Each structure stands twice: as structure tokens, then as C-alpha cells.
Amino acid sequence: MATPNDQDLALHGMNAKQGGKILLLACGALAREILDILTINNWLHIDLQCLPAIFHNHPEKITPAIEAAIGKYKQGYEKIFVVYADCGTGGALQRLCAAQGVEMLEGPHCYSFFEGNRQFAQRDEFTAFYLTDFLVRQFDAFIWKPLGLEPVSYTHLTLPTKLAV
């Protein structure tokens, strides 16, 4: 299966249909990792459909997009799994999945399920910030620019080349 480019994953998602009986509806930010797992295990019975990763910056778009995808694909698959945690939907995604009879990942967000939900819940504060290869390559588009934290340029400063003694 071809590796998708980051720009497509960020803005459009992807469809890795190979005739499987199970569909994974996932975040585009996790596409490469999921594709690697499918390939390594030769799981040809599983198809992957990813929503645009940029939805993490607009969590209100996740639930309607998952609902549309379930409606579009439900008849063509024996089982659909949603590879999202709550991801800022305020429980809306969980309620949708329960109503549709579709399983999803547990937890508040991917940081929690990466670490393990039980271990994550026991902590009073974050002890790790998880970066997938996708997020590292898309850090400007997903973090700096949307949060108004564009890196400060220090090119205007002149540093002394010799210290006075």
C-alpha cells in the first residue's frame, strides 16, 4: 500500500481500500502507524479510511465526519472500528458510536491511549508529549500557526564575537 503524503493526510484524509471485511475509521495523523501495523501483520481483511488530521484543531468536525463515514460505509463492511478517542468532542463521538453500534478507542485523547488509559488517569499532570512522525513534520501547520505561536526570529540581533575581559 502506498504511503500517503502528509499534506493529503492533513487536509483530505485517505482511503486505503483493499477489499477488507473490517473498516478502521481513523485520524489521518495515525495513518502511517496503522498502515505499518496492517502491513507487518499482513492484515488484508482490514481497510483504512482516514479523516483529515487537521480536524484535531477543530474537534467539532470529528463527530459529524465520523457519522457521515459510518453512513457511507456501514453496508460494505461486517464491522467498523473508530480509531479515535474522545479527541475534544465532549462525549459526542462516544454517544454517536454507541448509537451506531460501532466500537471506538477509550480515553480522552491519543496521549492517553498511547500511554495506557489507566496509567494516564493516575497522573496529576502530563509527563509526556507524544509526537507521531506526522505531527513532527506538520508541527508548523498544527501547532505554531493555529495557536499563534510562530517561532520568534532572532536574526535582527547582533551577538558580540569577542567578549571583553
What residue spans do the PLM features occupy?
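N-terminal basic/disordered segments at the start of proteins
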Residues: 2-40
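Short, surface-exposed basic-aromatic patches at helix termini and helix-loop junctions that form
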Residues: 39-42, 94-105
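Glycine-rich, highly charged phosphate/nucleotide-binding loops
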Residues: 59-71
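Short, high-confidence coil segments that cap the C-terminus of an alpha-helix
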Residues: 77-78
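Conserved small/polar residues in nucleotide/adenosyl-binding loops
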Residues: 155-161
